[in-house]
Regions:
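Short, glycine/acidic-rich hinge or "gate" loops at secondary-structure transitions
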Residues: 8-26
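Sequence/fold signature of self-assembling virion shell proteins
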Residues: 26, 31-65, 77-80, 86-187
Length: 187
């Protein structure tokens, strides 16, 4: 995933997007909050929490309540749970268990039964062991642009019958719509 550096700085106010805020904050100025009626919206989990059944469910509800810049509810779909290696086993339990994780009850696991999240992305280069994120299908969210298209070259050596190949390219990444990533720093 090309966006690991953006996720490592997701809560850092020194790295801002088009609305002047970090990628994940509780006060994006570019949208109206449907629930609070004020001039800000959030893609930060209300209360920082470790990855658990309850916190994941809260995040998924928050994603479904997202609004566009005019304050109208939009239908965002959660696509991928993004975690550091320390959370990969917990993430697998939460996404694949048929019943609610860690309980003796016979309750269904709604994340699994409703098919709310497809898969887990485990990023070994995340600097926080506790932060976790949910990527959505927001249009124009996390973006990759070509800085230099792929260039290929080949060179042969007549004396040794060796051939050398070379391929280079340059990409730039960033985000346009903060609704493409929701997250929490964890605990």
């Amino acid at each position: 995933m090309l966006f690991r550096s953006h996720l490592n700085r997701a809560f850092n106010a020194s790295y801002t997007g088009g609305d002047g805020s970090a990628l994940i904050v509780n006060n994006h100025a570019a949208a109206l909050s449907v629930t609070a009626g004020d001039a800000s919206a959030s893609n930060l989990l209300t209360t920082s929490a470790a990855l658990s059944q309850t916190s994941l469910e809260q995040m998924l509800i928050q994603i479904r309540q997202a609004a566009d810049p005019r304050g109208k509810k939009i239908r965002l779909t959660p696509k991928k749970l993004v975690v550091a290696p320390g959370n990969m086993l917990q993430a697998e339990v939460l996404l694949k268990s048929v019943l609610r994780a860690g309980t003796n009850n016979n309750d269904l696991n709604p994340v699994k039964s409703m098919g709310l999240l497809g898969d887990v992305a485990v990023l070994s280069r995340l600097t926080s062991a506790t932060a976790w994120f949910v990527q959505t299908d927001a249009d124009n969210g996390m973006q990759v642009k070509w800085r230099r298209k792929i260039e290929k070259s080949m060179e042969g050596d007549f004396e040794t019958d060796s051939v050398r190949y070379k391929s280079t390219m340059r990409l730039g990444s960033g985000w346009t719509d903060w609704r493409s990533m929701f997250g929490t720093a964890g605990t």
